[in-house]
Regions:
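Secreted/extracellular ectodomain signature
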Residues: 26-216
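Hydrophobic alpha-helical segments
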Residues: 22, 61, 200, 222, ...
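Compositionally biased, low-complexity segments enriched in small residues
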Residues: 13-16, 150, 217, 224
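A short, hydrophobic C-terminal helix/tail in secreted or cell-surface proteins
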Residues: 218-237
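Serine/proline-rich low-complexity intrinsically disordered segments, especially terminal tails, linkers
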Residues: 12, 23, 207-208, 223-224
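Sec-dependent, cleavable N-terminal signal peptides
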Residues: 1-26, 243
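Juxtamembrane cytosolic interface motif at the C-terminal end of transmembrane helices
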Residues: 20, 235-240
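Intrinsically disordered, low-complexity segments
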Residues: 8, 19, 214, 219-220
């Protein structure tokens, strides 16, 4: 009887472990189709919020970086073989002194690479595609693996330059917001709202290189199969215990 009970416990533990892995694998930091040595960027929307009263772009970069620190995104990057100390995070936002294109290095000053949401979906083929007035998918996944729907501070127009920028000193102090659930121009430039409000920010990584060898993180669909197998194991153990 003890052996049967052990079988049930073991199967249950296996099932629970697989279930946990499935939940963690929802974030994809090495998109499908990329090979070791390939370069790309990742983007996300923060789960946390802040005001837009500062005219110092570094305040927003620090906020975005702090959102990643210790998050599910950071864990997934480490699991995939990245050195977190070599990755920088910048806000996709503009102040009067620094445009979003310059701040993120998508102005041609850095390698021109594809840009992906942290769920594996492509946002833009390259820098020009990012700033052509539309993107390919919502930027609505947060660093803690939740869906973001709140408005996003950008201070930016569709071309990546400042428009009603972060820290706007005009009266009233209006700052441009975008929507994480839009792919047209509204993703970055929707309306202007008071800078004293609290909204989220978009974050973009520095240029990443797929590690060699790349660490493969199972897709959620594959993990579903493992979970099903775990369920069958558990069911079999229970049936045997009843005999």
């Amino acid at each position: 009887m003890k052996i049967k009970q052990l079988g049930i416990v073991s199967a249950g533990v296996a099932l629970a472990t697989l279930g946990t892995s499935a939940a963690q694998a929802a974030l994809v930091v090495v998109p499908t189709g990329l090979n070791p040595g390939d370069q790309y960027r990742l983007v996300f929307v923060t789960s946390g919020t802040r005001n837009a009263t500062s005219s110092n772009i570094n305040d927003y970069n620090t906020f975005v970086t702090n959102q990643v620190t210790g998050s599910a995104l950071a864990t997934q990057l480490t699991t995939a073989g990245f050195n977190l100390g070599t990755i920088t995070w910048k806000a996709i936002g503009s102040t009067s002194a620094t445009s979003a294109k310059v701040n993120t290095g998508t102005d041609g000053s850095q390698p021109d690479v594809p840009i992906y949401l942290i769920d594996g979906n492509k946002v833009a083929n390259n820098n020009a595609d990012l700033w052509d007035g539309s993107i390919q998918t919502f930027i609505n996944r947060t660093q803690i693996d939740t869906s973001g729907t709140d408005s996003v501070w950008t201070g930016t127009n569709v071309g990546g330059s400042a428009q009603s920028p972060l820290g706007n000193s005009g009266f009233p102090p209006m700052v441009t917001i975008g929507s994480p659930v839009q792919t047209d121009a509204s993703w970055i430039n929707m309306i202007g709202l008071s800078s004293s409000n609290s909204y989220t920010l978009y974050g973009m990584s520095s240029v990443l290189t797929v590690p060699t060898p790349a660490v493969s993180v199972p897709e959620p669909s594959s993990l579903l199969g493992f979970i099903t197998l775990g369920g069958l194991m558990l069911g079999g153990a229970v049936r045997k215990a009843r005999k």
